[in-house]
Amino acid sequence: MVIFMTEEQKRKLTGKMKRMLRAKAHHLEPVVWVGKEGSEKVIKEVDRQLKERGLIKVKVRKAALLYEDKYEIAEKLAKACDAEVVSVVGHVITLFRPREGWKKYLAKKPKKKVKKDEKIIELFEKFKKKAVKE
């Protein structure tokens, strides 16, 4: 069975990458505010800020939350601006779009970590073979 992944599915940030981006965004102040009239101007401004900075915070006003959930607003902004939602905390959305392209940030399969016990067993087996030869 062949499964085709869309470009959007391929471009998921790993948990480790999101953690790093949240740390970088900690000191940032919101640069865009979304009000009750979320319009094309807001999307254009978010897009412009992402081109300039790469990582931004967007503040969602209470009036905007009367019509939509903050998570829906975050997803709509991310989709419209070809970005990824890093976090949604309170009324602040953190968005990320790399300036140099997505290739560097594509989700990769994690490498298999060898447990310490397995390493010790391997070393013991090697030592045992050497001892038998001598």
UniProtKB/Swiss-Prot annotation:
Keyword list, A-Z: RNA-binding
Keyword RNA-binding annotated: yes
Disulphide connectivity of cysteines: none
Gene Ontology molecular-function annotations: RNA binding
Domain CRM, residue spans: 11-108
Record flagged with keyword Secreted: no
Pfam families named in the record: CRS1_YhbY
Protein name per the record: Probable RNA-binding protein MJ0652
Source organism of the structure: Methanocaldococcus jannaschii (strain ATCC 43067 / DSM 2661 / JAL-1 / JCM 10045 / NBRC 100440) (Methanococcus jannaschii)
Lineage, uppermost ranks: Archaea, Methanobacteriati, Methanobacteriota, Methanomada group, Methanococci
